[in-house]
Design a protein with these regions (language model features):
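Bacterial N-terminal signal peptides
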Residues: 7-15
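Positively charged n-region of N-terminal signal peptides that target proteins for export
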Residues: 1-6
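Short beta-strand/loop motifs in extracellular/secreted proteins, especially
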Residues: 73-78, 117
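An ectodomain-focused feature that recognizes extracytoplasmic/extracellular
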Residues: 22-72
Length: 141
């Protein structure tokens, strides 16, 4: 009969009780020739549509599409990174268009997604929180 040492038994028990937190995974795709990145939770979803090559002309066609369970028609969304960085983007019908957003705010939002980690999208009535791996190749400016 093999007897485990008390240290080994305690270590094994501790390893079993440590919760494993899975990162939220971006779903990456292409729509109408534009790269897309989507995150979904029970509380809503966010989809980023990028236009790094100006597929449809010189005007950027990027968009941040948001859906909140408790706030169907926000007019502003704030992207908050755990590091303290934040950016405000105007929203109309659930969409913040890159062409009409402030370029510096759009760049901060992209940097937050590119860096990964924990971040939240917040409206006056609802919020979505995600924790993702970095997206170092995200080209969405």
């Amino acid at each position: 009969m093999h007897v485990l040492s008390s240290v080994l038994a305690v270590s094994a028990f501790a390893a079993m009780t440590v919760p494993v937190h899975a990162l939220d995974a971006w779903t990456i795709g292409v729509e109408r020739g534009l790269p897309t990145y989507a995150l979904t939770s029970e509380a809503g979803e966010v989809r980023l549509v990028c236009d790094p090559d100006r597929v449809f002309g010189p005007t950027p066609n990027g968009a941040l599409v948001v859906r909140f369970l408790k706030d169907a028609a926000p007019d502003m969304v704030v992207v908050l990174a755990k590091s303290g960085e934040q950016t405000r983007l105007p929203v109309k019908n659930g969409i913040s268009a890159q062409a009409t957003a402030d370029a510096a705010d759009w760049a901060k939002m992209v940097a937050t997604f590119r860096t990964g980690g924990e971040f939240a999208l917040v409206t006056s009535a609802d919020s979505l929180t995600f924790e993702t791996a970095p997206l170092p190749d995200l080209a969405c400016e």
